[in-house]
């Protein structure tokens, strides 16, 4: 590495299911993703990798390195919402910038609607992207969307902002340029705009021999998918717009990998590919696919398990499959370790200065670098906490075992988002090695007998959760999770808060 620090390129799709990548499903879906597969061929593919249950939570978990219950960013961010990334929470970009990196984010953000939430207020030098999920962006084009003559300030107060291009200023402020709305037509090719901007950023840093951290977040494959005319039908007959656009998404990944090759940066760059959460299957056929139970916004594996691939030539062995538990939380510590900072978690826990600001936070991630490089054969993470979008702990995994405390009993459709979780008086137990798809409780004649035999796990599980959550006493949630209902607004009115 010429400057002693690897470049870091993080590529994320949106709501992409494990089955949608042919390195996982081997053509089962009727098309292939050779460019994304290349990352797996030249690096590591994970089988037990955890995102979060929805867009905002997954992105916050990655960039902040904290369980979303700490940041309060568990609920999908909507236009006009007040909740977003707070200045007290550092990001990977904040830390890498303090250690000499140029930082750029391109594509979907979804970490807050307001100026203070934008990436260029949270460690990024440059941002060009949109702020929400695609279906929210196209709402103003609906025939019955509120019009100015009836609701004069509705669009301004509650509608989506445009695609923003922003730059961080040296004095801590930012410059913001609104490039216009993300219309249905623009959705067909907006990822190409983001890719072009990311390419310019990478080329510029390559010319100046500056290490870079780039987070390239495509808008695809979130629903609703708008495929450009030239791509329609390219997945083959009897396929779908979703599959046609997955091929475009794969081509975009191929283009940015080819750029690294062209610039001679491939050997010096960590490339990490993933997505935010499990697929939103209730919008099928405009939806991702997973073999796991459930989907986005549930407590089941299908809501949390996501594809994940990472490549670092010469450091990470090629064609490796890892079965250990790894999560989005782990990349803050892992990427800083790769950049030569092995103790970032300890520094932040004690309180440390980054770019002139002192931060004191509890990182929930583990340094996975020795596991990735083959120095150790086991992941340092042996557990995962499943937090839903209300900020509640619905389940915990420890090694093989998963205990479900709250379950979503709706099988699918948007009822998954509307119906409450059911609190179980006795938690359900699953063995995620013998029953990885969590089907035993509704397919096995002997499940309840088996569970009764394993009731010895329940009290230790409670003790484990209490032990792991003890850090919340010193580092409590930064803000209360948002809600789609009216309870928070009513509570604020009763308290006399002006933001109500």
State the predicted function of each range.
Residues 1-427, 432, 436-500:
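Formylglycine-dependent sulfatase
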């Amino acid at each position: 590495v010429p400057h002693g620090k690897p470049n870091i390129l993080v590529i994320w799709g949106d709501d992409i299911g494990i089955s949608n990548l042919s390195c996982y499903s081997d053509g089962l879906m009727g098309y292939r993703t050779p460019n994304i597969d290349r990352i797996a061929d030249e690096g590591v593919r994970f089988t037990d990798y955890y995102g979060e249950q929805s867009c905002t939570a997954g992105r916050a978990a990655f960039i902040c390195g904290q369980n979303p219950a700490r940041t309060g960013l568990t609920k999908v961010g909507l236009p006009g919402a007040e909740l977003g990334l707070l200045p007290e929470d550092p990001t990977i970009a904040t830390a890498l910038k303090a250690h000499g990196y140029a930082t750029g984010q391109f594509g979907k953000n979804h970490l807050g609607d307001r100026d203070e939430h934008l990436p260029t207020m949270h460690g990024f030098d440059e941002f060009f992207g949109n702020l929400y999920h695609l279906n929210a962006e196209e709402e103003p084009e609906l025939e019955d969307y509120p019009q100015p003559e009836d609701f004069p300030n509705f669009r301004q107060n509650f509608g989506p902002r445009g695609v923003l291009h922003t730059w961080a200023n040296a004095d801590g402020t930012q410059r913001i340029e609104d490039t216009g709305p993300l219309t249905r037509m623009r959705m067909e090719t907006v990822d190409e705009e983001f890719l072009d901007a990311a390419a310019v950023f990478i080329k510029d840093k390559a010319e100046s021999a500056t290490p870079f951290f780039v987070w390239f977040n495509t808008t695809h494959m979130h629903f609703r998918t708008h495929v450009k005319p030239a791509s329609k039908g390219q997945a083959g007959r009897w396929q779908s717009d979703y599959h046609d656009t997955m091929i475009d998404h794969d081509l975009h990944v191929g283009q940015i990998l080819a750029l690294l090759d062209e610039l001679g940066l491939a050997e010096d760059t960590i490339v990490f590919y993933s997505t935010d959460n499990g697929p939103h299957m209730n919008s099928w056929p405009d939806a991702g696919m997973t073999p796991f139970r459930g989907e986005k916004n549930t407590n089941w594996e299908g809501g949390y398990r996501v594809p994940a691939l990472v490549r670092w030539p010469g450091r990470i062995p090629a064609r490796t499959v890892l079965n250990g538990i790894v999560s989005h939380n782990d990349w803050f510590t892992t990427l800083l370790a790769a950049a030569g900072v092995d103790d970032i978690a300890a520094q932040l826990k004690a309180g440390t200065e980054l770019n002139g600001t002192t931060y004191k936070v509890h990182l929930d991630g583990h340094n996975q670098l020795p596991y990735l490089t083959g120095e150790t054969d086991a992941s340092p993470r042996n557990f995962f906490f499943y937090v839903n979008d209300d900020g509640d702990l619905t389940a915990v995994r420890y090694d093989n075992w998963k205990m479900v405390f709250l379950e979503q009993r709706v099988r699918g459709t948007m009822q998954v988002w509307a119906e409450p979780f059911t609190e179980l008086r006795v938690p359900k137990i699953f063995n995620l090695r013998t029953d990885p798809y969590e089907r035993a409780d509704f397919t096995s004649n002997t499940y309840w007998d088996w569970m009764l035999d394993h009731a010895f796990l329940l009290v230790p599980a409670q003790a484990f959760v209490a032990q792991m959550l003890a850090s919340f006493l010193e580092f409590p949630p930064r803000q209360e999770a948002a809600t789609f209902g009216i309870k928070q607004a009513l509570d604020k009115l009763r308290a006399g808060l002006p933001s109500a």
